Swiss-Prot record, chain A:
The keyword Transferase applies. One of its GO terms (cellular component) is phagocytic vesicle. This is Putative glutathione S-transferase alpha-2. Gene3D superfamilies: 1.20.1050.130. Conjugation of reduced glutathione to a wide number of exogenous and endogenous hydrophobic electrophiles. Its EC number is 2.5.1.18. GO terms for molecular function: glutathione transferase activity. Residues 83-198 form the GST C-terminal domain. It comes from the Eukaryota. The gene is gsta2-1. PROSITE patterns: GST_CTER, GST_NTER. Keywords: Acetylation, Transferase. Residues 5-81 form the GST N-terminal domain.
Curated annotation (Swiss-Prot), chain B:
Belongs to the GST superfamily. Alpha family. It comes from Dictyostelium discoideum. Keywords: Acetylation, Transferase. Conjugation of reduced glutathione to a wide number of exogenous and endogenous hydrophobic electrophiles. Coiled coil: none annotated. This is Putative glutathione S-transferase alpha-3. InterPro entries: Glutathione-S-Trfase_C-like (IPR010987), Glutathione-S-Trfase_C_sf (IPR036282), Glutathione_S-Trfase (IPR040079), Glutathione_S-Trfase_N (IPR004045), GST_C (IPR004046), GST_superfamily (IPR050213), Thioredoxin-like_sf (IPR036249). The keyword Transcription regulation does not apply. Residues 81-202 form the GST C-terminal domain.
């Protein structure tokens, strides 16, 4: 277990559900300990509220569920929009990615997946074309989530029907990717992260 | 000012969380039952899905978990500190993304029903029962929050959709979850909602 004074994020070495918070922490320039495990040992499982990773430790405070971890960090750093309405429009997008998109490409049915991508990423692309941001008038966790989700599906390859998500089809989301990857913290994280299968 | 509106199909499923919440908080709202998504409503649906919540100020929101948190935030029902709020969020994500999705997959025959006993009950319901025994409230603190309501709805829902799960969960096996159910169902607004909710054609 970490004894560090900086927060720690524990997840498998793969990207998976750990990617959202890792990219977020890197983007916000928050020093953290990136702990990777190859499996959940019995000793580790005993410390996990639902026996699952990722887990985030901030001092004595322990949190699981990747979307919860990301929202907690984002809220602390004013990255959830400017008012209550914006906060929940961000939440709406974060939930859509976690509850609808991620489960679908883990159990893919090609025709359904194609429609799903068009529905969600089409909606995100349209919003970015109209206003430049997914919520409000500045970058929020919603933009970061769409970038990470989009990028991750492409990383997973054809098993996740990645060819559906081309730069040509979604130019504004491709710009979002460029924006985040030009951030110093994110660029450093990407350069140093290991090659993994998932 | 108009009343808030919640639009969803004439089934429990994802609409149940905000419906029970609105009833528990005694918020006067229009409970719109939708037969099918048609051109009258499709433009309001960000991802072509229900439920849809329209607040009294005209603000529209989809995704049942986002809707519930938005309503609860307006009524001081999401915990008092950033940590409590995060623990509420953690519970909601577990209910919505892990438990609810799994229940539906078992209901549709995509997932083996044995996994309810092997994974869902020990990892989630037993854990919640334990937390309630230790702390009285799921997010700690000193009052009920949306986390408690979400777990109650999931606890009631699983036995309704998967009758075999009722035998594994109810009848005193998880006394603190039973007390939670009692708390919410003795609330005047919730009791009235439960009494008046329609028997649905699809058991979902």
């Amino acid at each position: 277990m970490s004894t560090s004074s900086v927060p720690s994020l524990t997840y498998f070495q793969g990207r998976g559900l750990g990617q959202f918070s890792r990219v977020l922490l890197s983007y916000l320039g928050i020093p953290y300990e990136n702990i990777t495990v190859t499996e959940i040992s019995d000793a580790l499982r005993a410390t996990l509220p639902y026996g699952q990773l990722p887990i985030y430790r901030d001092g004595d405070f322990v949190l699981t569920q990747s979307s919860t971890i990301a929202r907690y960090i984002a809220k602390k750093h004013n990255f959830m929009g400017k008012n209550l309405e914006e906060e929940f429009l961000v939440d709406q997008i974060v939930t859509a990615i976690h509850a609808d998109i991620f489960p679908a490409f883990n159990n893919p049915v090609p025709e359904k997946l194609q429609k799903l991508y068009e529905k969600y990423f089409g909606s995100f692309e349209k919003k970015l074309q109209e206003t430049g941001f997914l919520v409000g008038s500045s970058v929020t966790l919603a933009d970061l989530y769409v970038y990470v989700g989009f990028d991750y599906i492409r990383f997973r390859g054809e098993a996740a029907l990645s060819s559906e998500l081309s730069d040509e089809k979604y130019p504004k989301i491709a710009e979002l990717k460029k924006f985040f990857e030009s951030n110093e913290g994110v660029a450093k994280y990407i350069k140093e992260r290991p090659e993994t299968k998932f | 000012m108009t009343k808030p509106q919640l639009s969803y199909f004439k089934v429990r499923a994802l609409g149940q969380f905000p419906r029970v919440l609105l009833s528990y908080l005694s918020i006067d709202y229009d409970n719109n039952y939708i037969d099918k998504i048609d051109e009258n409503i499709i433009d309001d649906l960000k991802y072509g899905q229900l439920p849809l919540y329209t607040d009294s100020n005209g603000f529209k929101l989809v995704q049942s978990m986002a809707i519930s948190k938005y309503i609860a935030s307006q009524h001081d029902f999401v915990g008092k500190t950033p940590e409590e709020k995060a623990l509420v969020d953690e519970t909601l994500a577990a209910v919505n993304i892990d438990v609810f999705t799994f229940i539906i997959r078992v209901f549709r025959g995509v997932e083996e029903k044995e996994k309810i006993q092997e994974i869902i009950i020990p990892r989630f319901f037993a854990k919640w029962n334990q937390i309630l025994g230790e702390k009285k409230y799921l997010a700690g603190g000193n009052s009920y929050t949306l986390a408690d309501l979400y777990v109650y709805v999931a606890y009631e829902y699983i036995g309704y959709v998967l009758p075999f799960a009722a035998d594994l969960l109810y009848n005193g096996k998880f006394p603190h979850l039973d007390s939670l159910k009692e708390h919410f169902e003795s609330n005047k607004g919730v009791a009235e909602y439960l009494k008046n909710r329609p028997i649905t054609e699809r058991k979902i």
